[in-house]
């Protein structure tokens, strides 16, 4: 599980959006050796944005049908049932999403990314709007997905949230990668120490 770690404005979301082709960029981006602009690559990754992109008038079930059919997924309904139960949204699935709280909308965004059975999951600040119990459930879900072979890239500025689950971290500052750390290589230092040693503390307010 790979983390893009950096203060607000470091370029984490820009990086995620570039990978998903939501922003124009210079150079080449490849996923498993395949250009990210190719249809195969696009079908292979799921994207969970920081701010959920949903249709206010559609219900959860209608969103599921729209995404499942757009991606031509075979078992999307069964997966949707699984994640709706996991996120405790059973009694909300017939409601228009405009009636849902911010945290619930974030959960809907997650389940829509997961019902396509992505090989790669790109997650931008996933804990925004979630209560502590939901954060723990989400972390456990990411660990389970990793064990199932899903490659996960998470951007965050909150170190403590990802401390227990990360394997590899790229620390960003001012649009650049300033450090790359593997958990297995850490000895006496913590990821938090490396983070603060790598970024310019005078210009950013850091959340730990």
Regions found by a protein language model. Name each.
Residues 27-41:
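Conserved ABC transporter NBD signature motif
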Residues 65, 69-92:
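Conserved ABC ATPase "signature" region
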Residues 96-100:
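Conserved ABC ATPase signature
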Residues 121-125:
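Catalytic Walker B motif of ABC-type/P-loop ATPase nucleotide-binding domains
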Residues 132-134:
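Helix N-cap at the start of a conserved alpha-helix in ABC-type nucleotide-binding domains
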Residues 156-157:
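H-loop/switch region of ABC-family ATPase nucleotide-binding domains
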